[in-house]
Curated annotation (Swiss-Prot):
Subunit structure: Homodimer.
Pfam families hit by this protein: SpoU_methylase (PF00588)
Gene: trmJ
SUPFAM superfamilies: alpha/beta knot
Name used for this protein in its record: tRNA (cytidine/uridine-2'-O-)-methyltransferase TrmJ
UniProt keyword list: Cytoplasm, Methyltransferase, S-adenosyl-L-methionine, Transferase, tRNA processing
Organism: Photorhabdus laumondii subsp. laumondii (strain DSM 15139 / CIP 105565 / TT01) (Photorhabdus luminescens subsp. laumondii)
Cellular localization per UniProt: Cytoplasm
Reactions catalysed: cytidine(32) in tRNA + S-adenosyl-L-methionine = 2'-O-methylcytidine(32) in tRNA + S-adenosyl-L-homocysteine + H(+); uridine(32) in tRNA + S-adenosyl-L-methionine = 2'-O-methyluridine(32) in tRNA + S-adenosyl-L-homocysteine + H(+)
CDD domains the UniProt entry points to: SpoU-like_TrmJ
Length: 241
């Protein structure tokens, strides 16, 4: 199950953070590291700071875009230390661990960590189902990247162990769309809204952002998403008559 959980680092600028992150992950049983467009490549310094977790670095998946790192994921959680102009569903580390372990039984999960200095962009955060905030001391909330990964990895580990100890009744499994399914839906929706004149192609403004937030909050099941796509296709056919 834990192998289905991806720790994703976006545009990391220090190899030491890669090594320390690998160490934090492996101590909690996580091994699936993704590096999105890293500004430096893993080196001997990263290996040294991994302290025996060099295999995590050696098997890390390096991609050039966040979309590629999120492909196939059914749940995406992005870390955010800053308040944003557009509110989003929030979780703290404990809930993040519980949701991640629950979803990892059925599909891949992504926990996304941003750049060391500026974190994730608003556009990147809009690709996430939830934003993760670590409730640190308001007078001194300075966490480095590896510390944040360690805290989240610990909560994932605790949720995993708790789930292993429980004998749960089997319920009907619900299939949720993957991140790439949702991106295709948003593209389809934006095309229909453009063609209908509801939004302007060059200036979609906040409408698409708010629609993303709406559907992220609702988190439609796969069958429900197919219905929505069918409605959009029906509107397109009607408009061509």
């Amino acid at each position: 199950m834990l192998e289905n959980i991806r720790i994703i680092l976006v545009e990391t600028s220090h190899t030491g953070n890669m090594g320390s992150t690998a160490r934090a992950m492996k101590t909690m049983g996580l091994t699936n590291l993704y590096l999105v467009n890293p500004l430096v490549q893993p080196d001997s310094h990263a290996i040294a700071l991994s302290a025996g977790a060099s295999d995590v670095i050696g098997h890390a998946t390096i991609v050039d875009s966040l979309d590629k790192a999120l492909a196939g994921c059914g749940l995406v959680i992005g870390t955010s230390a800053r308040s944003r102009t557009l509110s989003w569903p929030m979780v703290e580390p404990r809930e993040c661990g519980e949701r991640s372990v629950q979803q990892a039984e059925h599909a891949s999960v992504a926990i996304v960590f941003g750049r060391e200095r500026v974190g994730l962009t608003n556009e990147e955060l809009q690709k996430c189902h939830y934003h993760l905030n670590i409730p640190t001391n308001p007078e001194y909330g300075s966490l480095n990247l590896a510390m944040a990964v360690q805290l989240v990895s610990y909560e994932i580990r605790m949720a995993y162990l708790a789930r292993q100890d429980k004998t749960e009744q089997k319920t009907d499994e619900v299939e949720y769309p993957l991140a790439d399914d949702m991106e295709r839906f948003y593209h389809h929706l934006e095309c229909v809204l453009n063609d209908s004149g509801f939004i302007r192609k060059a200036h979609p403004g906040q409408i698409m952002n708010r629609l993303r937030r709406l559907f992220t909050r609702a988190r439609p099941e796969m069958q429900e998403l197919n219905i929505l796509r069918g409605i959009l296709s029906s509107v397109e056919k009607w408009a061509k008559k």
